[in-house]
């Protein structure tokens, strides 16, 4: 069944690097060339070897002591005779085929429904999109609406009236009809499902309506179902995730990321004032670098739209309003950050790993020039090598070691274990999974980790993700006409924003929180930033005191900006690891996870920590997020010396310590 919202556009390393003309050999060009990466004692030494063989340098990658090159087989053989070469990768011309959407496999139907319903006392219009060439045939329709609106007087699909005889069984507030034979309505392309009501006797003249008062489910031939989502009220005024994550409270105190630069390595940036300018209207894009063409540019065209959406989540400078009145908060998490936009992904959202490494290298090389403190990596691919051998992971580790806090997506390949992507598998960085708020931002009891969010451990047994953050149906700006909007027109709001779901969005949100922390404490190291986030995250806890999700699903729990500021610790980030030795190759690190012969994953004592019953997808009467919510729902008296029976965790003691810390902060 087609997901209600699109998942993260996973950016796998599939495009090929384009050679430059700085060193070329006409004879070699006539042979079948290989696109390779040569790694060795230094980038300069590798360049000299390639050039002396007559090959073409495509990428200077000194950050990992490597070059990308275009070589014939004979030239490659010559280069590899040198003892200076440590490693080469010669299959860059054979990229993996982009995965097909499993929801569309062997299907003859693909219909999407607009996120917004047009409704009034007179009737409703719901726009549907048939993305296949053949007409989509409606088989069954289930609707509900406020009873005060009366009964269905008429219905049409794509302008064609539905036989009134099919509507005879409708009652006040509901309709469930099966269409058969020639009476089945059809949809070609874009069309509206339109209903008109016959008012009930004595119905009030004025009725207050919200989208969540309606429900709709349409089943089309070919195993194709589309449902109306509840939606957010006044979504154009409030994107809600700044409030859910606690960023709005910091905005009210002037904490907006001012003075901190975040680099977003993605598909580019649409030059929209609410993205390129801060809350004061000042330009805040310090540089735009195209890692595909290896040049600094004035405009970084975003054909895909993904990079613009990530930047919007992170830095949208538009004010949050209520009934048109500014609240003092903003739609983006860090609306005053400075930005560096780096493009390494194409119109399809695909990127070659040499371009990605070059993009990371440019960020590290210009860290001091632009005060780059955060690097957002909302992409991933299945790991091909251990983290210390993966070229992207190697560059990411060097970025972290240089003082840049790197935040990466866990991926959208869940719910199976060991689905964390690269570079999210790097143990040092902050890896983010996703939760959804089920369209109820004020109610945390229905917040859950959706199946798509990738799970750990990593192949090297490290616990990932590190934490989870809001990533469901995230509103933001993207370029009109971008690939995303063309492929998913149903996720465009009438006010121009675009709604996406995935760990990409959760990652951009966390990058924004990191910028808020660094504005308050600019001397924080990346390790201490990570410590503040994971030590203050709120785990999902069941009523029996056991974890609702394993650490491979939720990491340390749900991140909150206010808790990171008030309760976050230092000194716990990457304890037991040594990035200097890791980069030097003198020591590499395995995590604590165990993996049995059947592929089962665990941790020492995990069975005693996590509930055996799967956590509900939606409203839960058992699950609470955070120690405070868990303890305050209990009926027994609070005694830190007698923790919850059957639980290895002393949540009572943790509650007392958190409360004391908050009270200490409130004292003058």
Residue ranges and their predicted role:
Residues 239, 321-322, 370-476, 535-537:
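Catalytic-core segments of hydrolase enzymes
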Residues 249-287, 296-354, 368-374, 401, ...:
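Subtilisin-like serine protease catalytic core
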Residues 44-101, 217-242, 247-252, 277, ...:
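Autoinhibitory propeptides
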Residues 266, 284-285, 424-515, 519, ...:
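Extracellular S/T/G-rich loop segment that most often corresponds to the catalytic His/Ser-adjacent loop
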């Amino acid at each position: 069944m087609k997901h209600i919202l699109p998942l993260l556009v996973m950016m796998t390393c599939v495009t090929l690097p384009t050679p430059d003309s700085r060193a070329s050999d006409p004879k070699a060009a006539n042979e079948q060339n290989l696109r390779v990466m040569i790694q060795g004692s230094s980038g300069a030494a590798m360049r000299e070897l390639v050039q002396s063989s007559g090959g073409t340098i495509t990428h200077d990658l000194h950050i990992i002591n490597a070059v990308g090159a275009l070589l014939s087989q004979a030239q490659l053989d010559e280069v590899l005779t040198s003892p200076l070469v440590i490693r080469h990768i010669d299959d860059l011309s054979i990229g993996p085929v982009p995965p097909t959407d499993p929801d569309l496999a062997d299907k003859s139907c693909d219909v999407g429904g607009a996120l917004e319903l047009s409704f009034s006392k007179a009737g409703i219009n719901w726009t549907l999109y048939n993305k296949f060439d053949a007409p989509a045939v409606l088989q069954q329709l289930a609707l509900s609406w406020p009873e005060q609106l009366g009964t269905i007087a008429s219905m049409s699909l794509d302008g064609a009236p539905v036989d009134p005889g099919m509507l005879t069984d409708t009652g006040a507030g509901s309709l469930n009809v099966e269409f058969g034979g020639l009476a089945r309505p059809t949809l070609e392309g874009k069309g509206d499902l339109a209903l008109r009501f016959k008012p009930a006797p004595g119905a009030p003249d004025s009725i207050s309506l919200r989208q969540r008062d309606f429900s709709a489910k349409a089943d089309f031939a070919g195993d194709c179902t589309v449902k109306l989502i509840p939606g957010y009220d006044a979504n154009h005024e409030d994107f809600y995730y700044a409030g859910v994550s606690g960023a709005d409270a910091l905005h009210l105190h002037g904490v907006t990321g001012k003075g901190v630069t975040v680099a977003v390595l993605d598909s580019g940036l649409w030059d929209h004032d609410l993205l390129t300018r801060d809350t004061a209207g000042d330009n805040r894009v310090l540089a735009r670098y195209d890692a595909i063409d290896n040049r600094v540019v004035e405009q970084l065209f975003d054909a895909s739209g993904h990079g613009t959406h990530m930047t919007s989540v992170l830095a949208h400078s538009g004010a949050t309003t209520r009934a048109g009145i500014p609240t003092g908060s903003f739609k983006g998490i860090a609306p005053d950050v400075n930005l560096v936009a780096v493009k390494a992904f194409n119109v399809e959202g695909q990127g070659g790993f040499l371009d990605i490494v070059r993009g990371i290298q440019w960020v590290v090389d210009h860290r001091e020039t632009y005060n780059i403190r955060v690097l957002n990596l909302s992409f991933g691919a299945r790991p091909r090598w251990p983290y210390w051998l993966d070229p992207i992971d190697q560059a990411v580790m060097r970025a972290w070691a240089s003082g840049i806090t790197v935040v990466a997506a866990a991926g959208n390949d869940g719910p199976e274990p060991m689905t964390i992507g690269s570079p999210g598998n790097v143990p040092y960085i902050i890896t983010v999974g996703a939760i959804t708020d089920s369209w109820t931002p004020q109610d945390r009891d229905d917040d859950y980790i959706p199946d798509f969010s990738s799970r750990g451990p990593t192949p090297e047994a490290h616990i990932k993700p590190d934490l989870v953050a809001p990533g469901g149906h995230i509103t933001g700006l993207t370029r009109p006409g971008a690939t995303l909007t063309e492929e998913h027109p149903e996720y465009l709001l009438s006010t121009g924003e675009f709604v996406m779901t995935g760990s990409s969005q959760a990652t951009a949100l966390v990058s924004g929180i990191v910028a808020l922390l660094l504005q308050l404490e600019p001397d924080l190291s990346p390790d201490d930033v990570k410590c503040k986030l994971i030590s203050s995250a709120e785990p999902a806890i069941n009523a029996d005191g056991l974890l609702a999700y394993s650490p491979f699903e939720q990491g340390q729990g749900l991140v909150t900006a206010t808790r990171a500021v008030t309760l976050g610790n230092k000194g716990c980030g990457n304890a037991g690891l040594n990035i200097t030795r890791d980069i030097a190759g003198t020591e590499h690190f395995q995590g604590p996870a165990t993996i049995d012969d059947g592929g089962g994953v665990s941790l020492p004592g995990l069975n005693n920590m996590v509930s055996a019953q799967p956590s509900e997808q939606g409203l839960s009467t058992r699950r609470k997020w955070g120690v405070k919510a868990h303890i305050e729902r209990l009926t027994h008296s609070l005694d830190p010396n007698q923790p919850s029976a059957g639980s290895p965790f002393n949540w009572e003691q943790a509650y007392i310590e958190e409360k004391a810390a908050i009270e200490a902060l409130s004292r003058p």
